[in-house]
Structure formats: structure tokens, C-alpha cells
Amino acid sequence: LYPCDVKTRDAYANMDVAGYNYGIKRYRHDLKKYPKRMILGSETFCADAYQFMQEAKRDKRIIGDFVWAAQDYLGEVGIGAWEYKDYAPRFDGGCGWVSAGSGRIDLTGKPLGEMTYTRVAFELEDLAIAVVPVDHTKDAHSPSAWKMTNAMESWSWDGCEGKAAKVEVYTRADHVKLYINGECVGTKKPKNDCKVFFDTTYHNGEIKAVAFDANDNVIAEKTLATAGKETVLRAEPELTRVNADTDLCY
């Protein structure tokens, strides 16, 4: 590890808590070197949630974690966005890009895949399923370290019957089985994180994950189902008038 503590050791010695930005790989090293130090993750990646929880359980001197970002926001356009060529041909964050694209919650307040993952990593839920947009399963997207996944809790992909699908399952269980319309399509064990990936084929109907302990006892089940033909979407604006280019219309 680079000895960057030559710049911080004197300052941190006079502080109650040391704030670390994207420094989770230093936690163990620095706590061993400075036994009286208290560490707070003052800015971290969404993908570090599981590792943070494991470190915090191991050492009570790690007292908290602030992720960038909790909710998407205006500005820093595209810094945390995963967009595809059909929507953003240049991946340059230029004209047409509005928000950062980063966050466990989107601009409308909807929890995203990162939030789902975090709840499992923090032991608030036992199991969750998220699906990468099936119409873009194998497509390249804009790069960003501030987004962990664009998978969502949906098994409704109209026009994608028979296409390749990538399913993410989040669990702390010993192993998990994935079923599509009652047929088991695979069994996997989480390794150094609480997520596993299944490459499968999309079929309308039902997808179910079943989590097991080491003795093959069922811990939890989670199911997603395809929306029926009667399902419709309706948009109702909160305001009847907004300013062009400056206001958001909810």
C-alpha cells in the first residue's frame, strides 16, 4: 500500500473520526497501525456494501459508510450512468444527458438494483432477484465505477421471448437455485460477495430463486412474474406547467 498516511496521520491523530474516501482496502492495514483510530467510510462505491459490512462486523472501530450516491441527482452528468448506444451514441455526457445516473435510488424515488443488493449485504433481506435489461443483455454500455449494476426487479420483457438473459441473485445463503417456469436452470454458491450470476434464456412466466443453508434447508424464496396483457402504464404529471430545460416533471 502506498504510504499516504504521511499526509493524514497527524491530522487524524487530532480527530475523533477519520474519514476515508474510497479507502476500504486500507481499513485493516491502518487499524492495525493506529489502534486508537475510528474509521468512517465518508465516500464509497455501491459495490463495496458487502465488504464494508464484513469489515464493520469484524472491527467495531469501523463505524459507518456513506455511499456515492444514495439517490441520483442533477449535475455531474453521466458519471454513474450505464446507457446503451441506442440511447446515448457517444457516451460523452453531452447534450441530452441530465442527471449523474449514480445512486441506489433514481430521481423518482424508485429503489434500484444497488439498493436491492445493499439490503441483502446489510442483512436486511435474505434474498433478491434482479435482471439485466433483456433487450440489451450482450450490449456494451457507457462505463462508470459509480454504478454497480443496471439490473432491476422485473421479469416483464415484451418481445424478448427466447433471448439471452442475465439474472443477478443476491443472498448470503450457502447456495441458491434458480427456476424458470418450474424448471431449475442452475445452482450457484456466492464466493467473496453476496451475489451470483446466471446466464439463461428469457421466457414469459415466472422466475424464482430459492436460497439454502449448508444443510440444504430452505432459507428464503423470491419470485418475479411477467406482467399480464391487462397491465397498462399511466403517466399523470404533478404540475400542469414546468420550465423547459430547468425543471423536472414528476
State the predicted function of each range.
Residues 1:
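Catalytic cores of extracellular degradative/oxidative enzymes
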Residues 10-247:
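Substrate-binding clefts and catalytic carboxylate motifs of secreted carbohydrate-active enzymes
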